A protein has these predicted regions:
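DNA-binding alpha-helical recognition surfaces that contact promoter or target DNA
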Residues: 50, 64, 74-75, 166
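Short hydrophobic/aromatic patch on the recognition helix
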Residues: 56-66
Length: 200
């Protein structure tokens, strides 16, 4: 009896592990499909039906993870804000010129690891924003903190961390998109960002 009981527990554990793996795989497919479609058409321009068709999953599977497409968009966006904050935290305490280089590296690294999500940050609408507001504000606060470090070295072209934050919001990601397929993407992006933000 004991052997049969142990075998049953092992079988149940195996089934649970397989179910967990399947759920994780399905969620990842929804995230990838949503990220691609949202980046191409905007969040408002994509329906749940289009997401599940792209992911090749059922409507029931979608709603098992997300209440609506705004929750899906938030799940795509939150990791990029978290990763960005973690990267910016590593720049604290660096000399101003190294912080400036590290800031550009942060944008380039995020582009490599969270490209579609990064593209969405510029098209967040009023329906999605409440889902990611706290992380968005925290990222901007961390970014401003690093810009203030750079400002302390009298390096900012406009002499203002706050104004440079606005410049980055308008140009940081669009420039990544522009140079994305260029053979010298990293060099051109770095040179462009330095020209926009840092004194010669």
């Amino acid at each position: 009896m004991m052997g049969a009981s142990n075998a049953s527990r092992r079988a149940n554990a195996s089934r649970r592990a397989k179910a967990a793996y399947r759920d994780s795989e399905h969620r990842e497919r929804l995230l990838e499909a949503g990220a691609r479609l949202f980046a191409l058409h905007g969040i408002a321009g994509v329906s749940v039906a289009e997401v599940i068709a792209q992911a090749d999953l059922s409507r029931a599977t979608f709603y098992g993870f997300f209440a609506n497409k705004n929750e899906l968009a938030a799940a795509i966006l939150l990791p990029v804000f978290d990763a960005g904050q973690a990267a910016l935290a590593k720049l604290e305490g660096l000399p101003p010129h190294k912080a400036a280089d590290g800031l550009i590296d942060t944008y380039l690294d995020l582009w490599q690891t969270h490209k579609n999500a990064l593209l969405l940050t510029g098209i967040i609408d009023s329906e999605v924003f409440p889902y990611i507001a706290s992380q968005h504000h925290a990222f901007n606060a961390a970014l401003l903190k690093i810009l203030q470090v750079i400002e302390s070295g009298d390096l900012l072209r406009n002499n203002s961390a706050e104004l440079t934050l606005e410049v980055l919001a308008k140009t940081g990601i669009p420039l990544l998109r522009i140079y994305n397929n260029h053979d010298h993407m990293e060099r051109l992006y770095r040179e462009s960002m330095l020209a926009l933000t840092i004194k010669v």
